[in-house]
Amino acid sequence: ENHNNYLQRLHGLFNYGIKRGYLAENPTKVIDKVKVAETEPAIFAAEEIKALLNAVPRRAVPYFAIGSFAGLRPREIERLDWTDIHLEEGYIRVRPKVAKTASNRLVDIQPNLRAWLLPLSCESGPVTPPNIRKIREAAQHKIGLTQWPQDGLRHSYASYHLAHFKNINELATQM
């Protein structure tokens, strides 16, 4: 967490104290927020995604394919069950207990994702194998990736989806 996040939380806490009569004013008013330079999120090149998918064991392919071609967050993929993946109907159901936002959403399965998932699909059970971080690190080393950007697969999906479909509103509903 950064300075601004802490400041925001403290501001709310002190406002609560003011409403209860414990304080006359909020002391966080005099603290300046830190100006954070906006940076573009790092993404993977298409060749890197292909190399990654070919470098991981078969059992881990669905995790990386869903991150790359459906844009789910790592924790969302880790919580997915195969019963959430509807290949025939063409969507992944991200249930509230799976989603970061605790809301239900349906994410389209694009043809490239379907092609990766179809030969590996199961009727039920966890999508993500145990020790996914170790699997990722081994594959990353194998293909020579020195950095693993936070949410890199998700950001890659967003960038490529927007470039292909040119519809920010559609992308927002998928994310």
How would you name each of these model-derived features?
Residues R79-I85, A172-M175:
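A short, basic/aromatic helix-end/turn motif that makes direct DNA contacts
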Residues Y91, N104-L106:
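Well-ordered beta-strand positions in beta-sheet-rich domains
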Residues K35, I43, V94-A102, R114, ...:
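Catalytic-site neighborhood detector that most strongly recognizes the C-terminal catalytic loop/helix
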Residues E1-N15, R20-Y22, E38, P126-N131, ...:
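N-terminal core-binding DNA-recognition domain of tyrosine site-specific recombinases/integrases
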Residues N4-Y6, K19, L23-P74, E78, ...:
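Basic, Lys/Arg- and aromatic-enriched nucleic-acid-binding interface segment
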